[in-house]
């Protein structure tokens, strides 16, 4: 269960206006910035989080979702049904999908208790448009590390990198 919760938590970290400060052309820097900002807020804002667990949704919305390509990820979930949906149905779906991500990641982040993370060393990007980045979550209480492999995609419209998929081991 811990792995599952950390998996969801780090998708939020991957990935998601916080993204504007980092180098948008480097997914490794974006990954590091998202993780650092999220973990810093989790550490520093525990009183607010304990008083109102829904506050985690705010952290997710502000620190993680700017790094996530929500529409692309949501379209992948819809699969073949994406093309048959009307624009109004798509808009409603993406709004609901975004709220789902905030809720799911917020619940996962509620499990934060001093974990640290390590991001894999940067690799040359070349002409790649999809890049895997491994993040390892280290628990101070000696639990086995959790490996998270994020897929970052170069947005074909903006040229910026955003996370859209994650696998946990």
PLM region spans:
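Sec/Tat signal peptide C-region and signal peptidase I cleavage site
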Residues: 16-23
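Short beta-strand edge/turn micro-motifs at domain boundaries
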Residues: 145-169
């Amino acid at each position: 269960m811990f792995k599952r919760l950390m998996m969801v938590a780090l998708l939020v970290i991957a990935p998601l206006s916080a993204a504007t400060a980092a180098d948008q052309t480097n997914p490794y820097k974006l990954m590091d910035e998202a993780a650092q900002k999220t973990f810093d807020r989790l550490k520093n804002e525990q009183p607010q989080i304990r008083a109102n667990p829904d506050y985690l949704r705010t952290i997710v919305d502000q620190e993680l979702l700017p790094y996530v390509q929500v529409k692309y990820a949501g379209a992948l979930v819809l699969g073949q049904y994406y093309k048959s949906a009307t624009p109004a149905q798509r808009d409603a779906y993406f709004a609901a999908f975004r709220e789902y991500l905030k809720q799911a990641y917020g619940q996962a982040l509620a499990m934060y208790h001093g974990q640290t993370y390590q991001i894999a060393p940067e690799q040359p990007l070349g002409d790649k448009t999809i890049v895997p980045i491994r993040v390892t979550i280290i628990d101070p209480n000696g639990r086995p590390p959790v490996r998270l492999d994020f897929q970052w995609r170069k947005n074909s419209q903006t040229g910026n990198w955003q996370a859209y998929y994650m696998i946990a081991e």
